[in-house]
Amino acid sequence: MKVSLPAFEKARVLVVGDVMLDRYWVGPTGRISPEAPVPVVKINQVEDRPGGAANVALNIATLGGQVQLAGLVGQDDTAHALTLGVQTLGVEPQWLTIADKPTITKLRVLSRNQQLIRLDFEEAFDKADSVRLLKQSEALLDSVDVVVLSDYAKGAIDQPRDFIALARAKGVMVLVDPKGSDFGRYQGASLITPNMSEFEAVVGTVTSEADLLEKARGLLKQHNFDAILVTRSEKGMTLVTANAPELHIPTVAREVYDVTGAGDTVISALATSLAAGADLPQACAIANTAAGVVVGKLGTSTVSRIELIEALALHHGESGFGVVSEDQLAYALEQAKLRGERVVMTNGCFDILHAGHVSYLKQAKALGDRLIVAVNDDASVKRLKGDGRPVNQVDRRMAVLAGLASVDWVVPFSEDTPQRIITRLLPNLLVKGGDYKLEDIAGGAEVIAAGGQVQVLGFEDGFSTTAIIQNIMANQ
């Protein structure tokens, strides 16, 4: 399946669930304690990361989605640290503070990239606390497209059936990362995402692929779910729906360092993709790719849109050069700048590529290490040049440009001027051919404001696409 990313910035998601703080103490071990046969860790790094439902919300925000987060916290310093952690990425916390309970904290001691011990600081919340949280969250349903219930069995989500029913009645999809042996608590959910252990805790041991599908379809019918996505570690994922064939998605993980938070990443990528307009199979493929990225990181982590673009490109065997999308180019440009490469950018219609174009692009490339050529799509060429243009469709124009040794990346744009795409990419040097004044070059002011430069190059005399077309017409 060829996967493209939807406009994540359009996604509006509410996450409700068990929020917690993941705290890491990190340091070297060089000796065994004289008091007991345990290593002594000299702590030289302390790090706090939002975990549980808060990690789901951060993953959504990192992908570019708009997200609100509802959860139960204590009246303590940990709650303050958690608030700061989620607000850093623009997540709106909607806490319900329970004064006599601590904010859940998971403290991990690490050395040499290995977890030595985990210490949990928590007390289960009361059922009444969950009722109040879900009631408070009802007011947020009108402002979102998807709800995620992130259940870690800590008490935030006790009996959510009425909340799910209300959300579905409002046309809001409800995704659940479940816990426990009673999936009936999530009756009517749009999608649940158990891992294999969680799935078998409910349905019993799975003996074969056919058995998995039969048991999944039984759960769909029993609890009125629209779909079940079973995450299966090295076997990837299996999506089962009521009205379509099952979908098996193989894993794309290259290296596995830590599975902490992988389930959070799956449901956050699903929620963001679905809220942005992706269909369910596409959203599952995106989530599978995101999970493959996050297990290659240590500790509770997030996955960015740029990382997803890179992972999808690698999965599809793409080199990262040639004809690319804007998102692919944004990632490639970021990497080029990290390598210290000077990036030059130009633009045009390039309807019939001629020797003047080739010479101009060679000059442009000589001014830096990499050259981007932004190409007007067919509709914008017609608006600029009139009926009968372009002679060559944009895919063909870009393919020819990508074949030139001087050109590294070719990207289409649909506006009459390249102002928007230049402003997004901000090359080190923007060049334009002809007799332009610097102040009249689209995107030039933005490039200069970002510390870049703008330069005008001359075209070789005697070459013109219009003249070539007229000459062809005259000789017919």
From Swiss-Prot:
Pathway recorded for this protein: Nucleotide-sugar biosynthesis; ADP-L-glycero-beta-D-manno-heptose biosynthesis; ADP-L-glycero-beta-D-manno-heptose from D-glycero-beta-D-manno-heptose 7-phosphate: step 1/4; Nucleotide-sugar biosynthesis; ADP-L-glycero-beta-D-manno-heptose biosynthesis; ADP-L-glycero-beta-D-manno-heptose from D-glycero-beta-D-manno-heptose 7-phosphate: step 3/4
Example GO BP: ADP-L-glycero-beta-D-manno-heptose biosynthetic process
GO cellular component terms, A-Z: cytosol
UniProt EC number: 2.7.1.167, 2.7.7.70
Keywords: ATP-binding, Carbohydrate metabolism, Kinase, Multifunctional enzyme, Nucleotide-binding, Nucleotidyltransferase, Transferase
Xref: HAMAP family: HldE
Protein name: Bifunctional protein HldE
Classification of source organism: Bacteria, Pseudomonadati, Pseudomonadota, Gammaproteobacteria, Alteromonadales
